Amino acid sequence: MIDRPLYVDKIMAYADTPFVKILTGVRRCGKSTILKMIMERLKTERNIPAERMISCRYDSMEFEDMTAKQMYAQLKERLCPDGKTYLFLDEVQEIRGWEKVVNSLASDFDVDLYITGSNSRMMSSEISTYLTGRYVSFRIFTLSFSEYLMFRSKFTTVGEPKAELANYVRLGGFPATHLQAFSQDEIYTVVRDIYNSTIFSDIVKRNQVRKIDQLERVVKYTFNNVGNTFSAKSIADYLKAERRALDNETVYSYLEKLEKAYLLHRCSRYDLQGKEILKTQEKFYLADTALRYSVLGYNADSVASSLENIVYLELCRRGYTVNVGKTSDGEIDFVAVRQNEKIYVQVTQEINSEKTEKREYERLLEIHDNYPKYVLTTDEFAGGNYEGIKTMHIADFLLSSEY
């Protein structure tokens, strides 16, 4: 196992506390492996014996017909009679009513609970009802650029970060695809299988979606328009033009389901003058850039929006709440807020014309505050400072600890 301290360190801070630790994220982003890392840390750092740890993976056939009552009875029977039991419950959303089970175990027994799930129902009102104030959640993402370089270095010679960024864009960051030297086609085969299982298990099967072709058309439109503002109406109009009529409500429903399965991230617009979240013309980003290419095929014209996608995910990984900033006559790619911190970020593949340079810098110059402002690019010699706006190569930004 290759350590992922970004998550393990944060979760370990809550070990041996009454809080239920909930790990969520897209399928195969590494949640199960992180649970194993936590188990190992508990053994080595806190001398917790293995017999005090119980691990169950509920997407196994073994638990296919299990009820919440059976889940509770089985776990209760295995608890240590004296002292604390450490419970690691993987993919618990597969058991209907798991919230009650977790609540009862946390309330009635001396347990330290860690659970994972691949659907945002994990964070639904049900959990708030049963575990109010007694859980902490951790969103797990696919590999960051830094993690990607570390994983790849275990089996191959890794190039200079600026050169490796192009590979990271194409290959994405699903951990299982970077444990050995897979080809691009082999990686896309794995990622396509992740996509298919997510669509079928977390969307079609769970929600009894019948018109799968409609869902897939919405997916492909969204994947093709990463980083563009659009609405359910614009998707419906596009499908109508293709003689595939679909009403706005159905489109909204599909987008919501894709979000709940963690395939998509919704990025709302924030009016920088009115200081309010706008409810129209949102952007959507993917859980991983390889999802796009495994479904639609690789296209060099999409690199610019994939770079934007990567920067968005990195800001989220670091705990920022991220919105698109609406200015008087345009937009800032990202306004990222974390507690009392704020940064503004513009992402452009290249600054290859005076027009591009003017567009990227002028919008940031409209903002009259002292928070950090960045223009990120893949220009080889990117750097410097222009009227307080810092220019950085995207690879340097992704590896930086300054924000």
Residue ranges and their predicted role:
Residues 54-83:
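Short glycine-rich substrate-engagement loop in P-loop NTPases that contacts/grips substrate
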Residues 26:
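P-loop (Walker A) phosphate-binding loop of NTP-binding proteins
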